[in-house]
Design a protein with these regions (language model features):
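A contiguous, basic/glycine-rich beta-loop/short-helix subdomain that forms a polymer-engagement track
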Residues: 320-344, 355-364, 473, 477-649, ...
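N-terminal pre-P-loop "Q-motif" helix
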Residues: 14-33
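Conserved helicase motor "Helicase C" RecA-like lobe of SF1/SF2 P-loop NTPases
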Residues: 687, 691-701
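Conserved interdomain hinge at the start of the Helicase C-terminal
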Residues: 581, 651-689
Length: 701
């Protein structure tokens, strides 16, 4: 069947794109259109790379939508062909082909109509919610001013002693009391809100899910924020009001970045935040009837959560915008972003969230028929290694062993036989790790090496655990969520044993409640004081790594410099073994960066079945590799490289390490920069070999 092609990009936000920008947009467009394509595209920093990638990819999404409206059969519709004929059939009668085209066009029209109505509804409701929030904020301000004014008057008329302030009932004023009641009603968190409202109870309509989804990943959230800024400058990001090309975008991040609940966010470590969030989302009650308080930004806030999701889809938001809006509307940005993900045309997320299979699955990211783009891809191989690395210290495994023993002793009469069996295996494995690491410390007296390398199988044999089925244990830990239970109970026990604290603890004992100035504030304990939650997750990560093939990685057992502690660390050797899951599931994978050279080495690490050294286009049985590298947008006529051997006063410019601290040399460099600035109308940029030398020169100047 014919493929979509595009040579011009009128949606590019600037009048005349550079030739290399047009070429990059074409390459991205073509890689997205050709299913099972691996694109490796190199474009120098400062050439508008991110904008070109966005326009190329989103133009493809828009063209696919328009092709469906024309009734064209696309490559991703073969399996859903209702007529039951093969795409290769050329003997179909004209009336059957005409009917098939008309049916697809009708179906596409209906889907587009529903999707368009849904998008219009989202934008209208987001606008209405924004208006309501503004009115509410203004009303809050006026009511507070009225209450404060009344309170000030009372203080001026009736000065109280400290004793009276403690025991005397507040003076009653009907006006101020009415204002207080209005304020309470206005600020109430809709606790009587019906969780089964029609607005939120409707199931996800698969027909409204985008046919194609672009997943753009970068290393940091700040880089993704820059992508949002570029998107807003295009018609796809809402630069033109009510444009049919506008897409829905969703920025995905972890709880640590999006949590707006101070009692949870103040916990510090990501592991504690995750555990606490899961506890509060369940809103259970203990046997002593001490409720684990539900999160006020999630529980009975379903309408606000829906409105936040709709606002996120209505116009592009980075995670800072989403978190700020969530705090204002008292709705959880993390769960709003997750619920927005299925309906988004463009998904923005950091490397780690997509590369790690379990994280990707927990977020609900579906790679099928999606085009995955990795920006700044020179970091990609390291990101794969980091995502699947694991490390645990002797102190951590001791802590986990203590928690496991306490947990089993407490609940052994209520645990099923299967749970007890797996927990016994986990306990024996943890105890074996403790033994090996203690032995490693004892080797200090024998002058043994501080670090040694071993294979996965040899390490398990050394621990006496080579008969343990790591796959079965890993599956148990993943499906039972027992690690979360053990960590939570361990935190509860730790809180109960903390005799040094005389105040209150919150529901699960993770946060101290301290009275400050008449108010109770949540005070997070030192995350390094007893990091039990992180210890459990560190051990589960190591077990997950030990289920790898023996050739995929190695185990490093090492002591610290003091010889009082030891650790075991898994390092991944074969990035392709993990990255191939993304390649196999996604429609196409595109790597983009300013400097990807040497490209053959990058390809060999991520796509070893392809040989990139021979051609710019490599075909294999399953995938096609497309490579492209362009020059800079600066014309050659605008470049004049000059080597300056001496300065204006004849001082030789010797910037070797031993001579560059010479004061006379630094002064001569200053004269050169001063002269260059006088004749350069746009200013001058000066690059130094190190930050320290730049600071030294700047201080002298």
């Amino acid at each position: 069947m014919p493929r979509l092609r595009r040579t011009e990009f009128p949606t590019f936000p600037y009048a005349t794109p550079y030739a290399i920008q047009i070429e990059l947009m074409r390459r991205v467009y073509d890689a997205a259109e050709r299913s099972k394509t691996l694109g490796v595209f190199e474009s120098p920093t400062g050439t508008g790379k991110t904008l070109s990638v966005l326009v190329g990819a989103l133009s493809w999404v828009d063209d696919r939508r328009k092709a469906r409206l024309r009734g064209e059969k696309l490559d991703d519709e073969d399996e859903d062909n209702a007529v039951g004929t093969k795409p290769s059939d050329t003997n179909e009668p004209d009336w059957l082909r005409e009917y098939d085209t008309k049916r697809r066009k009708t179906d596409a029209d209906e889907v587009e109509r529903r999707r368009g109505a849904r998008r219009a509804e989202l934008r209208a409701r987001a606008k209405a919610a924004e208006t309501r929030a503004t009115l509410k904020t203004n009303a809050e301000k006026r009511l507070r001013e009225k209450i404060e004014s009344t309170s000030t008057t009372q203080r001026a008329i009736d000065p109280h002693t400290a004793e009276e302030n403690e025991f005397l009932v507040d003076a009653y004023d009907s006006g101020a009391e009415g204002a207080r009641e209005d304020l309470r009603a206005l600020l109430r968190d809709d606790e009587e809100e019906d969780d089964d409202e029609d607005d939120f109870s409707r199931d996800e309509d698969e027909a409204l899910r985008p046919a194609q989804q672009i997943i753009l990943c970068s290393r940091t959230h700040s880089q993704l924020t820059q992508v949002i800024g570029e998107l807003r400058s295009t018609v796809f990001g809402g630069k033109v009001a009510k444009a049919e090309e506008q897409v829905a975008a969703a920025a995905i991040a972890g709880r640590a970045q999006l949590c707006v609940n101070p009692a949870v966010k103040n916990l510090g470590s990501a592991a504690r935040i995750n555990e606490r969030c899961l506890e509060m989302s369940k809103s259970k009650t203990t046997a002593k009837d001490k409720a684990v308080k539900a999160c006020p930004f999630l529980s009975k806030r379903r309408r606000a959560l829906l409105e936040l999701k709709e606002a996120a889809l209505a116009k592009p938001m980075d995670i800072e915008d989403l978190a700020k809006l969530g705090a204002t509307r008292k709705a959880c940005p993390y769960y709003a972003a997750r619920s927005a993900l299925p309906e988004a045309d463009l998904v923005l997320m950091p490397y780690a969230s997509l590369l790690h299979a379990d994280t990707r699955e927990s977020l609900g990211v579906r790679l099928e028929n999606a085009v995955v783009i990795f920006d700044e891809a020179h970091n990609l191989v390291d990101a794969v290694y980091n995502s699947y690395g694991a490390s645990v210290t002797l102190e951590q495994v001791r802590d986990v062993l203590d928690m496991l023993t306490t947990y089993v002793d407490r609940f052994k009469t209520r645990l099923s036989a299967s749970n007890l069996r797996y927990l016994k295996v986990l306990t024996n494995l943890t105890r074996a790790f403790v033994t090996v690491l203690q032995k490693e410390i004892a080797e200090v007296k024998k002058s043994a090496p501080e670090k040694r390398l071993t294979s996965l199988n040899d390490f398990l044999f050394e621990c006496g655990q080579d008969t343990v089925n790591m796959f079965s244990l890993r599956r148990y830990l993943k499906e039972s969520k027992v690690a979360h239970k053990i960590a939570s109970y361990g935190e509860r026990v730790r809180a109960g044993d903390d005799a040094s604290w005389g105040g209150d603890w919150d529901g699960v004992g993770q946060v101290k409640i301290e009275a400050v100035g008449g108010s109770k504030l949540a005070i997070a304990p030192d995350p390094n004081a007893n990091p039990r939650v992180s210890a459990v997750h560190a051990l589960t990560s190591l077990i997950d790594a030990l289920a790898s093939a023996d050739t995929d990685g190695r185990i490093i057992v090492e002591r610290d410099e003091s010889g009082t502690s030891a650790s075991v660390r898994f390092i991944l050797l074969d990035a392709a073994s993990r990255f191939k899951r993304v390649v196999q599931q996604a429609r196409s994978v595109i790597l983009v960066g300013g400097t990807l050279a040497p490209i053959p080495e990058l390809v060999s690490q991520l796509f070893p079945e392809l040989n990139a050294a021979t051609s710019k286009t490599v075909e294999s049985s399953a995938h096609a590799l497309k490579m492209f590298s362009c020059g800079h947008i600066i014309p050659r006529d605008n470049l004049l490289p000059l080597a300056v051997p001496v300065g204006p006063t004849g001082v030789s410019l010797d910037f070797t390490h031993g001579a560059r601290s010479n004061v006379a040399l630094i002064d001569e460099l200053g004269r050169i920069v001063l002269n260059a600035s006088r004749i350069a109308p746009g200013g001058a940029c000066v690059f130094f070999p190190s930050f320290k030398y730049a600071d030294d020169v700047y201080e002298r100047w």
